[in-house]
Regions:
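Long, well-ordered core segments of solenoidal/helical folds
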Residues: 1-14, 54-72, 121-136, 186-203
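Carbohydrate-binding/catalytic loop surfaces
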Residues: 13-33, 71-93, 137-162, 205-225
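Long, well-ordered mid-to-C-terminal structural blocks that present hydrophobic/aromatic surfaces
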Residues: 94, 98-137
Length: 249
């Protein structure tokens, strides 16, 4: 199935373009999720194609999507990684970038704490935390513009459940990789804020959508987007991180 996915992605015209046919662009989403998909399959099946894909995705993120001039990882770039200076091209999705950071840190751990990957994952985490953490109200906001222009998406300053779960995981991996107490402090910061705002204290489960100030935007516990994935994954990955909290020599 994984090989079929790669074949579909590599076959021109087989899948509808994510962006307009007249706009040649690369997307961060498929690039980063293939790291995690290959990693999960590799835990059960050994196949060189999995390591190859992980290497290719990490190289693409470094080459195309990381933009030091903005200290940001962009969601959409030109074919050579150039900035597409439009509303969509300038978008930073902090939660998505933080998720990428822990995918890379997890791979660094798999490689006995590969220093280059640790450095890369930490850099993405720190960039994305700076863009995403709301210094006034707390929590990770949805979207930013790399030039600090107004963001087009109407939910840009809301707090969705899943960016918080990714930040909880990423900060634990960062602490595990470095033993730097600041990442443990960041973990406590995001964890405390998340558990103070998202769980329904009367009936259980989490709300999915908060206003910027942390009040509930709508009370649904699940919909076509919010399913039983990000929260249990956060709990499982955090538990496994806590089983071992010191980096390899």
């Amino acid at each position: 199935l994984f090989k079929r996915i790669l074949r579909n992605l590599a076959t021109p015209g087989l899948l509808e373009p994510k962006y307009l046919p007249t706009l040649q662009a690369r997307g961060h989403s498929i690039t980063m999720i293939l790291i995690n998909t290959a990693s999960r399959i590799r835990a059960a099946i050994s196949d060189p194609i999995l390591d190859t894909q992980i290497n290719e995705s990490i190289a693409a993120i470094r080459r195309y999507f990381m933009h030091p001039e903005f200290k940001a990882l962009l969601e959409m770039v030109g074919l050579d990684g150039e900035l597409i200076d439009t509303c969509n091209g300038r978008v930073i999705n902090p939660g998505h970038c933080i998720e990428t950071a822990w995918f890379i840190l997890e791979e660094a751990k798999h490689r006995h704490w590969d220093k280059d990957l640790v450095q890369m994952g930490i850099r993405i985490l720190e960039w994305s935390w700076e863009w995403g953490w709301d210094k006034e109200y707390g929590g990770i906001i949805n979207f930013r513009d790399c030039r600090n222009f107004p963001v087009q998406d109407y939910s840009q300053d809301m707090k969705f459940w899943w960016p918080q779960t990714e930040a909880i995981i990423a900060t634990l991996y960062a602490y595990q990789a470095t033993c730097d107490e600041k990442y443990l402090d960041m973990h406590r910061q995001i964890s405390d804020w998340t558990y103070a705002h998202f769980p329904d204290k009367e009936y259980g489960e989490w709300y999915g959508y908060l206003h910027r100030d942390g009040t509930v935007a709508q009370p649904a516990k699940g919909n076509i987007f919010k399913g039983p994935f990000h929260i249990p994954r956060m709990m499982i990955r955090s538990y496994t991180c806590l089983l071992y909290t010191s980096p390899s020599p």
